[in-house]
């Protein structure tokens, strides 16, 4: 099992969709940042999952299935833009390893967010619950605008959420440690009940089920 978690990649020839120039690109199957720490920086700076044409300077994100491993943070994150039988079989094999948090994402932004949450020693399950709470407080703003996304972010020791609106653009909502701890304590039993030792897609849909189920209990 350990061998399946070592950094590995394959070279693939891709054609620029704009000018047709052919490129030989390194596509990672496994990214083990415990073994190769620099790869984390490459992800966070949008260099690793990126197509860049030196001929016409065309750039675009390149999302493909890969496994992110950080043994120090005790987490594995599988990014699968499209689920298929081969990926399901691979995930089933990886799930035999116990005692490590396993997450499933389908895009680069969610992968980066999970990495940031883990690096700050926070629980992504708590973060997703807080997102739902904050969205509930933004109902008035959402009457004449569309919420596109909400993502965890931080600057040194200050936590926040970046809120992406269609018209207003990007806003920021602070997150205090005190409020995080309150939510963590309040929902710890519900979180445990809805968690399992397998690859979980922990997002706002997952968090919404917890809040809906426990609405009457806490109100």
Language-model features, listed with the residues they occupy:
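Histidine (H) residue identity feature
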Residues: 21-23, 121, 194, 215
């Amino acid at each position: 099992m350990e061998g399946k978690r070592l950094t590995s990649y394959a070279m693939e020839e891709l054609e620029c969709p704009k000018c047709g120039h052919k490129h030989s690109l390194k596509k990672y199957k496994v990214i083990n940042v415990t073994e190769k720490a620099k790869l984390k920086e490459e992800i966070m700076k949008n260099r690793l999952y990126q197509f860049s044409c030196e001929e016409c300077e065309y750039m675009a994100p390149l999302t493909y299935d890969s496994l992110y491993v950080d043994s120090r943070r005790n987490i594995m994150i599988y990014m699968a833009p499209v689920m298929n039988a081969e990926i399901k079989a691979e995930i089933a094999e990886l799930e035999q390893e116990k005692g490590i948090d396993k997450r499933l994402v389908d895009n680069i932004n969610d992968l980066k967010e999970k990495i940031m949450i883990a690096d700050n020693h926070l629980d992504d399950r708590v973060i997703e619950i807080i997102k739902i709470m904050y969205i509930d407080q933004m109902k008035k703003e959402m009457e004449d605008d569309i919420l596109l996304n909400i993502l965890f972010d931080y600057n040194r020791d200050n936590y926040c959420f970046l809120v992406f609106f269609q018209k207003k653009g990007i806003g920021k909502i602070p997150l205090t440690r005190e409020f995080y701890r309150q939510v963590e304590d309040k929902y710890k039993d519900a979180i445990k009940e809805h968690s399992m030792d397998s690859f979980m897609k922990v997002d706002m849909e997952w968090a919404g089920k917890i809040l809906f189920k426990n609405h009457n209990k806490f109100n």
